[in-house]
Amino acid sequence: MCPSYMVTLDERDTTRARANMLRSVIDGTLPPQELTGEHMKKVMDLCVGCKACKTECPSQVDVASMKTEVLYQMGREHGFSVRQRAAGHMRRGLALAALLPSLYNASSSTRLARRAAALAGIDPRRRLPSVARKTFSKRFADLPQGAGPARVALFNDTWNEYQRPEIGVGAVRLFAAAGVEVLLPRVVCCGRPMLSEGLVDEARKNARRNLDLLYPLVESGVPLVGLEPSCILTLRDDYRKLLPEDGRVEKLSGAARLFEEALLELEAQPPLSEGSPVLLHGHCHQKALVGTGPTEDALALASDVEVVDSGCCGMAGLFGYERGHYEISMKMGERRLFPAVRGAGERVVVAPGTSCREQILDGTGRRALHPAEYLAQLLAE
């Protein structure tokens, strides 16, 4: 069921209401201008793009893709806001911040920075994202490598490159311990932030660029491994819709793996010591398109795993950062996730999604780990 409806109990926030509104425009019950009108904007506003309706709804209505199309049409008619363009091109912004990480991190926590962010539509109660002192790509050459012949290609997403390179470091160490060589191909943003803002043309351009960059590896049989579920699953799911006529897409989609899937497919697992019990919160796109099974099984190589039946965490990419969404975002988290984390005791909290980990930190003060980060801590010396 739609996460926003679960906290508002407003019929307008149901999958049914959103689908019916669109159907009414398509069949002529409502005039065409309603597609980009104020009422449509309100109906779509609290859709968090979780994709649950794509698998849980009996009709398999993909409202997340519908919202992307609505935002695209609104942008074409009324123009895209500065906030939308900045959010869609987050990788570009973080790359600039990473040029002077200490200065950026020091200034981003100031009251002036929060006020400036508020002018761009960010709720001032949210912490602004920090950047790492050294990007993942600059650390990569110094990391250990497996002797092969098994190889994987790591899709270096925005968050791993600029914010949490320790996750990528952990993943490479785990693969190396299993004898696997990790390749780091050049990539551009997967396009997920652009799709979330309706910037479909820009997302399509990035999809085509990534396809050109990655296809030679994929064609040679190298699996493409992603650390951020929403990024790698954009390649697996959304690229088919963005580039339906490109015959290479199916091969790329078939080669895309979540980190945990790739780890489980190895002939030999890395040597791990026994870890603490784990509380796992799954990412929405992963739950909708893959399920949490691979993550549970990967963590179970070293730990007892309990899964939170929590639905959406409430952050949903940039949704929870936006002014006007903060309260409902926190209510989504408070439904089940935050109480479960507060009651986790000695269990280590694990969440594959970047926005999920940020929401858990904001809502409970507790830092959640990525599966690769957690398992790398357990590598036997």
Predicted regions and their residues:
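Cysteine-centered iron-sulfur cluster-binding motifs in ferredoxin-type domains/subunits
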Residues: M1-P3, R12, H39-V61, G93, ...
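Glycine- and acidic
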Residues: P3-V7, V25-P32, H39-T55, V152-T158, ...
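Iron-sulfur cluster-binding electron-transfer modules in prokaryotic oxidoreductases
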Residues: A64-E381
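Ferredoxin-type iron-sulfur electron-transfer modules and their immediate structural context
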Residues: M1-L46, S65-G79, G88, L103
